[in-house]
Amino acid sequence: MLETNNHTNAWQGFKTGRWNKNIDVREFIQLNYSLYEGDDEFLEGPTKATETLWDQVMQLSKEERERGGMWDMDTKVASTITSHDAGYLDKDLEKVVGVQTEKPFKRSMQPFGGIRMAKAACEAYGYELDPETEKIFTEYRKTHNQGVFDAYSREMLNCRKAGIITGLPDAYGRGRIIGDYRRVALYGVDFLMEQKLKDFNTMSTEMSEDVIRLREELSEQYRSLQDLKELGQKYGFDISRPATNFKEAVQWLYLAYLAAIKEQNGAAMSLGRTSTFLDIYAERDLQNGDITEQEVQEIIDHFIMKLRIVKFARTPEYNELFSGDPTWVTESIGGVGIDGRPMVTKNSFRFLHSLDNLGPAPEPNLTVLWSTRLPENFKIYCAKMSIKTSSIQYENDDLMRESYGDDYGIACCVSAMKIGKQMQFFGARANLAKALLYAINGGKDEKSGKQVGPSYEGIKSDVLDYDEVFERYEKMMDWLAGVYINSLNIIHYMHDKYSYERLEMALHDTEIIRTMATGIAGLSVAADSLSAIKYAQVKPIRNEEGLVTDFEIEGDFPKYGNNDSRVDEIAVDLVERFMTKLRSHKTYRNSEHTMSVLTITSNVVYGKKTGNTPDGRKAGEPFAPGANPMHGRDQKGALSSLSSVAKIPYDCCKDGISNTFSIVPKSLGKEEVDQNKNLTSMLDGYAMQHGHHLNINVFNRETLIDAMEHPEEYPQLTIRVSGYAVNFIKLTREQQLDVISRTFHESM
């Protein structure tokens, strides 16, 4: 048992229980955290060292922009946990150290997901991949991407090309796995290795395929922990043992996360739920007089600074889907325990306070687990920081706690999972709007004219009949669900085989829950289109080949986003219906089906891939992001828009329901105190309506227009998009225009 070793002084002053005999971080937190219900008066400003380091980061960021988005990159060394020497911003000033290569801002080369992707990322920025490295990963070491395309069917390839399924993680790391990085700080690496060895030695001796695979995975996990210790040694730390103070706890935890991002470039490399855990160490050191509040904030600021400069080399195609260089270093803050105690600590404030000390930023993806039972002072502080920075997203803890307990985190944007006990197979999105066009055209693509879906006679009537359209739409969704799940099964089989997340999984229990995280795009377009067909008169317009390529609408129809049950119920039905169809298909590793209504910035790409739709949206125009109403159609004010989105049922969308909400400051009130109060009331109301997620932007449209014209004046302008935050000036002009075209609510 761990308590018999020589490191018990690391836990001096902590309340003990099961956690000091077996891995149980949740119990450690519940026994030892200190609820804070006070205000923000205790917070400290940035130290001189913090300001100096942040100036250095801003200078490097400026140089990166001037170099076309890439400061430097490795073109020869495949990144692993131990591949590069230690790197620093300023070793004498940094309180938390460690970067992905030997230099900050130098991006690593990660070929295990796909050598073609790695090569394309190099060439996109004027670099050349080392020929010997390319040869190794082409001729001798197969990659995830190669494996997937070896197994894809022609039907899957056609769907991918047409964009009825797109954004699939078949050419990039899947991500969305959260290692329990807290375990390294609490237990030290040696104990974690002992536990993995114990699990390996007590496994079934009946060598089925599942057992053999798990034995190999455990061996890889064990080796990754050895590498993690070596990484610690490179920076002068012995992380084989538990952390003994707050500074070590932050450093140990960060090194574990650093190891993960050195080894994987997943689309979302989320951090978990660390602030309350780390606060336990801070409170102990403060009580003992070993540290000051200013020193605690400085360490947090330096930790946040490191999370802000996480970088991966991406291809232009990837950047179209996930624009603005996001990494989704998502940190989940707050929430309420299953015993009813809020889990807000002083560290909850300190993490958000970094937005003052360092200025606004998109990373880490600061996510407040909102509950109506959070302390009022914390609610007000969150509202104040949202209005000031537009850098925070909110997710309904009262909704998620029922399914995930009180030690879950958010992966990527809106996907809840129990930390260290659950992972997901990320599945991008199926295009429900395009599927509706396939139903009308008998499986033919409205843009290319090719037969992509199942072949049957297209609709021939001069006016679309709702019942006829829906009957065919249902069949098309049946087909789409099948090809979608089967594509994901191939992708995740190959990812486990060729690009396994061994370190992240080493920081999980050996027996875990897996989910198959599907998603849908174009929900509001599909719902409004069906509403138009049902309540107005929609005439299809055909080209010379008889393909429906446009629509003429006579009359008005209910539009999603106005709290009108006639169309909102269509949206709800689509979500429930498609989820039922997905569940009818077997998943890889018996993972549980989940679904998201989330698009990231790929709503622009989906729009490009989709022709004219029966709701009046023109070919190529962006979809609304996530579960949002289409731009400008939610005309009855903020609360009606929120009410429509809140109707989407979380029970069949447990991978998350993203809602991005923009409001002008004056609509929240004239005075700051009124604005803060009104925003907290709005969040409480949305939570009570069972709304899941809310990105909040508070600014005027004119600010964004000026930033487009004068980007140099807005280096830290941060906005929330579908599920994450981004530096506005890093978006493409097309995506900037899409953001500006969205609804800015001027009334509640």
Curated annotation (Swiss-Prot):
Gene3D superfamilies per record: 3.20.70.20
Residues bearing PTM Glycine radical: 723
SUPFAM superfamilies: PFL-like glycyl radical enzymes
The EC number(s) this enzyme carries: 2.3.1.54
Positions of the catalytic residues: 412 (s-acetylcysteine intermediate), 413 (cysteine radical intermediate)
Record InterPro entries: Auton_GlycylRad_Cofactor, Form_AcTrfase, Form_AcTrfase_GR_CS, Gly_radical, PFL_dom
Signal peptide limits: none
Pathway the protein contributes to: Fermentation; pyruvate fermentation; formate from pyruvate: step 1/1
UniProt record similarity statement: Belongs to the glycyl radical enzyme (GRE) family. PFL subfamily.
Further remark: Several mechanisms have been proposed based on complexes formed with substrate analogs. After activation by the glycine radical, the cysteine radical, Cys-413, can abstract hydrogen atoms from the other active site cysteine, Cys-412, and from coenzyme A, and it can also transfer hydrogen atoms to product radicals. The other active site cysteine can attack the central carbonyl of pyruvate and covalently bind the product acetyl group.
Name by which UniProt lists this protein: Formate acetyltransferase
Organism: Staphylococcus epidermidis (strain ATCC 35984 / DSM 28319 / BCRC 17069 / CCUG 31568 / BM 3577 / RP62A)
